[in-house]
Amino acid sequence: MKQQIRQEKVTASFTEAKAIGFHFRGAHYHLSIIRDVVTNDILGKPPKLAADKLRWHLAGFYWELVATFDCTLQVVAAAYELRLARNKVRWDANFRESLSTMKVANPLIDRIGEVISSDWYQDALARRNAITHWDPAFVQALVADGRVVSVRMLNQEDLVPACERLLSNMREFFEYAEATLPAGRIQFL
């Protein structure tokens, strides 16, 4: 019985590891559509022509990006057998206490805390939450002569490079996670 439970936990970690790649590829896909919409469907055209398409893919991008991180926490919980219900795995006091109880000494744990408190992750999380309620993910179009000339974040950063930066940060994080988890247990992509 104990061996079966252990096998289920290992399987869960591999399942979640596959999900990380799935969500990351999903974010990458949505970014490719965002790039195409901004470049080909919005710039130089009347505003709102492709606004819905952009919003759908922005929502998908942010949901998949945050899901990549959430699945990484699932993998950590499974890899270290933290005995947390899968629907209760989140970076909170219970998770950190379980890591402490299991005497997990891995630099990944500190890195998870750094990511959670980082500006880029908080930005992605805020955008993911905001776009659900029709805040267009803090995006604005600069219009001149009735045509869109640029699509930017409200902080004036161009939309596509901003999304590319977030995706790059997430890739760096989960590659670090893959390298620091117990050898042979996890392969994300």
Where are these regions (language model features)?
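Short, positively charged
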Residues: 68
